[in-house]
Amino acid sequence: MWSTECQRTVDLTAEVLWETWIKVLSGDIELPKGDRYEPREPVGPGASITMTPEGQDSIEITVIRWEPPHVQADRVSYGGVELTFTHSFMPAQTQGKSVVTTRLDIDGPGADDVGPTIGPGIAEDFPQAIDSLVQAARVDM
């Protein structure tokens, strides 16, 4: 398995971040330079969503973890490996703040070889994506 993550502590509650993230997944909000999401059914456990990364072809992701308002994860098969994206919004020790984490796990045969090749390119926009989500949450409040 190969993994990477990006984490930020922000001055918003997990609930506010979760609500905004669900609007992104539902296609109600499109983040600048972010992935575009088009759900095929109501967003929740097992939901199938068409995700279109900016400038790339669409892929089908499936929601595999759903723990409102703290964790959502989705998975896609790609080139013989499984890519799992986990988005978490956890309360920080300081009241009113949260730790936002976006994590990528690449699993399956050959993941140790494929992960370092494709993973950094996939995850390079994680910092910008978190910043855009936080900005959208502030506007949405």
Predicted regions and their residues:
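Secondary-structure boundary/capping motif
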Residues: 1-3, 48, 85-87, 101, ...
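Short, exposed beta-strand/loop patches in secreted or surface proteins that constitute
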Residues: 38-42, 62-65
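Generic recognition of short, well-ordered alpha-helical interface segments
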Residues: 12, 58, 124-128
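Short coil-to-beta transition motif at edge beta-strands of beta-rich domains
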Residues: 43-50
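Short, intrinsically disordered, mixed-charge
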Residues: 19-26, 68, 128-131, 135, ...
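Hydrophobic ligand-binding cavity/cleft-lining segments
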Residues: 1-41
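A conserved amphipathic terminal alpha-helix motif
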Residues: 99, 105-141
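Hydrophobic-ligand binding "helix-grip"
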Residues: 52-99, 105-108, 135
